[in-house]
Amino acid sequence: MNKQEILQKLNLSLPVVASPMFIVSQLDLVRACCYNGIIGTFPALNQRTTEGFEQWLIELNEEFAQHEKETGKKLPPYGVNLIVHRTNPRAMIDLKVCVKHKVPIIITSLGAVKELVEEVHSYGGLVFHDVTNKRHARKAIDAGVDGLILVSAGAGGHAGTLNPIPFVAEIREIFDGLILLGGSLSNGKDVASALQMGADLAYMGTRFISTDEAVASDAYQRMIIESGTKDIVYTAALSGIPANFLGESLIQSGFTQDLWDRKVKIDLGAELDTEAKAWKDIWSAGQGVATIKDRLPVAELVSRMREEFREAILSQQQYLKNYA
């Protein structure tokens, strides 16, 4: 399936994927995204057990099928994030459940596995893989993924350090599939900019934390709204993998500034526990907080982004008059 065929299959009204966020992304957020014309996603590990995860898939599949039956209209697909790392004992078990229920999109992190891609392709599913550099991108391409998620500097949670402009250009030279760009995207103008750079879809997380449907405390959402770029801390001190967090939440949880540069062995075991107190009090976010000023329902947010996107594209025509 080529890139254009994939884009048509996604059936989007705005080229946006709401990225899967630990704890934050649950069914209400996924539904709201898909019902409003964008892709909603969630981590499999947001359900504490594989049995609970499977129930979520059954619920979504039945609801989406019923919607199509009643309206004759197909919703954009949803996606599930699988952490493909040796410290995640559920990875392959959850994959089997995804294959069983034919999850439309699988987003893989921390490991591009050819056998996984083949299993998802066996039922017509798509695989998108997180990458932070060209070396990881090549491995994912060799594994046969349909899309690469370029996690650039400033993205919330696990993030890279590359500027998005050369990053997209560098990967486009070696990959003609779908490119999703993540990192500090918060509005429709940012979505238009991502496409101007050569990406096909915008991959947006932090903006969706401050919505009515997100599973995030009032304090978390308030800190998102009140923070700027200077308040985001990039550290590997928690799990061994560099990630962006709200600095104030680190300090309040005892991770003071003197600990931010410490080196620890990669271990996602505790991080992947939704009940771990630390992950309810330590909050990830990207530099896109700088332009997030409110909390609102997903429907209103997507509607506003759609108009911002349209205005941004139209405004580019003025530059042709001025400089062409």
Language model features with spans:
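Active-site entrance/lid segments in N-terminal catalytic domains of soluble metabolic enzymes
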Residues: M1-L178
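Residue-level detector of alpha-helix initiation sites
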Residues: V24, L185-S186
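Conserved acidic functional residues
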Residues: D130, G183-S184
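Conserved active-site-proximal phosphate/metal-binding subdomains
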Residues: T161-L180, S186-A324
